[in-house]
């Protein structure tokens, strides 16, 4: 530094004007002059204090302005490239003519030689230009030292006080910061190099600025190259580098231990998880086995299920006993539900099979007619504000079937005796019933919801009518007291509430004047009209007697469901023996056959007749033809003929002259009380009203034998009840 300040810089200022004049036309001179002019302009724009300008032009007249600018830059110790270039050109001339010699300290030459011989590379990084550096070491006071130098760097690579400059040099020489040692006498440059990671040694030469204690503490300070502990510095540098590497490795290790710990934990967790997985798998397997057992139990009876559960609980470990118990308790209700459902399903299937067997024995034609009629009835009800009708079906107990069979046998054996004992009584009752049936108009078949008792009801032919009048009249009162605003009608088919022996026949359908006469052969329309006229005459003569006997009638209550009335008109079960014996008796008269007795029976579980077909083998078929439902009977007298069942469903009470029944709304032609019919409808409170016509002797035989009469229900369209 002292050499530059004392020798080089004064030499450049003294020889710059001479150099410019001697070399003005040289390209190097022209280039450096242009660079100085640009620098002056920049300083002017930057408003640097004391900034000078260089006039434009190529004449030598501007040389004095150039000299003034160089002096101003040197006074500021500026290290601009243009200034250093011009100084180097002037120094080169002085080095060539020997005017000046490059000054180096005595220890420099020996150190450079030793370091080079040791295989180390030496580079020069100076604020002076590369050319000036070379000239100085080439023309040094100790000879040519350029041979010890591997390279030169000036401010073109960057300022010496900037970190990036040193990083750029390291990149250029392909070395790491730990492998490099930077020697300088300027603390600012030392700090920049240190920031870049280089090893730094500060040289304290005579004439340099004093170093502070902090600087000495921060850096290694030496006074000569010989004092530089290069080996130790290199070792320390290597050690430092190694230390840095070790530190970095430790830092990496410090970062890695958690990973290793995690790995250990993972390994530990893996073992723990393996154990837990094994434990979890066992309950899972048990649960699976439990599920399988539960499924098997659902298919098996409840007793088998209990055994499986007990075996599973015994096989389970004590630790899982509570869980298994809980699962078993949860599975039990489901199994019971499944068992009950299976049993109920089996029962339903059995009933369906029975229904199918009964249905197969019936003719297809009545079914189709009934289905069509039912469909029409549903459409009519959907259009009008009709009420919902529910039907509750109950299975027929086996005991009822057995009673029916026994009663059939009793009827077969004692039919003749019964006919003889009650023949006289029946004749009288039949005669009394004739005028009542003729006098009672068809309009009275409609049951109203008022509490006024029916004063004129047809006579009931029943052996139990006299025995139990008090019992059945309260029931009739209850039926009439039912509210007329009923919105739903339920048809409940239940087992008979009274024994089969006490089956009663009531006349609840006073439409005898509308029914055809029951004869072995159907009478023509003219005879029917004639018979009706005669009956009306007789009815007028005996009003008092008819009224008195009508009061003794014990009928099953019929509950009105707001405009809906259901009546039953089905064929009466007949016995071949009775038919033969009754046909042979001379006491029978043709007028008796003309008599119409309407019988109403409580729906019984013992009856199993649909559409006129009975299980005892004697059958009648009620075949609806063109709106008529008539009982077709063989003419040989083997079976009792049933009169035409004419049911008015329009509620006008007028019988039809031709015996046609309003079948358009009839949906119960195939109903039975014993087997639930597919299209059956009935009345509320579990009872149906049956309208059946039989000759007097046959009816008497049925009453004595306590025979259950089959009934079918025929719903009528809504009729507004009189309030």
Swiss-Prot record:
One of its GO terms (molecular function) is acireductone synthase activity. Its main location: cytoplasm. Residues 311-320, 596-606, 636-647 have a biased composition (Low complexity). GO terms for cellular component: cytoplasm; nucleus. Pathway: Amino-acid biosynthesis; L-methionine biosynthesis via salvage pathway; L-methionine from S-methyl-5-thio-alpha-D-ribose 1-phosphate: step 3/6; Amino-acid biosynthesis; L-methionine biosynthesis via salvage pathway; L-methionine from S-methyl-5-thio-alpha-D-ribose 1-phosphate: step 4/6. It is found in: Cytoplasm; Nucleus. The keyword Protein transport does not apply. Residues 262-284, 293-308, 322-406, 419-443, 468-479, 487-496, 511-565, 577-593, 653-666 have a biased composition (Basic and acidic residues). Residues 239-723 are annotated as: Disordered. Gene3D superfamilies: 1.10.720.60, HAD superfamily/HAD-like (3.40.50.1000). Keywords: Amino-acid biosynthesis, Cytoplasm, Hydrolase, Methionine biosynthesis, Nucleus. It is an enzyme of class 3 (hydrolase). It catalyses: 5-methylsulfanyl-2,3-dioxopentyl phosphate + H2O = 1,2-dihydroxy-5-(methylsulfanyl)pent-1-en-3-one + phosphate. GO terms for biological process: L-methionine salvage from methylthioadenosine. It comes from the Eukaryota. Its EC number is 3.1.3.77. Substrate binds at residues 126-127, 160. Signal peptide: none annotated. Bifunctional enzyme that catalyzes the enolization of 2,3-diketo-5-methylthiopentyl-1-phosphate (DK-MTP-1-P) into the intermediate 2-hydroxy-3-keto-5-methylthiopentenyl-1-phosphate (HK-MTPenyl-1-P), which is then dephosphorylated to form the acireductone 1,2-dihydroxy-3-keto-5-methylthiopentene (DHK-MTPene). Monomer. Belongs to the HAD-like hydrolase superfamily. MasA/MtnC family. This is Enolase-phosphatase E1. It comes from Culex quinquefasciatus.
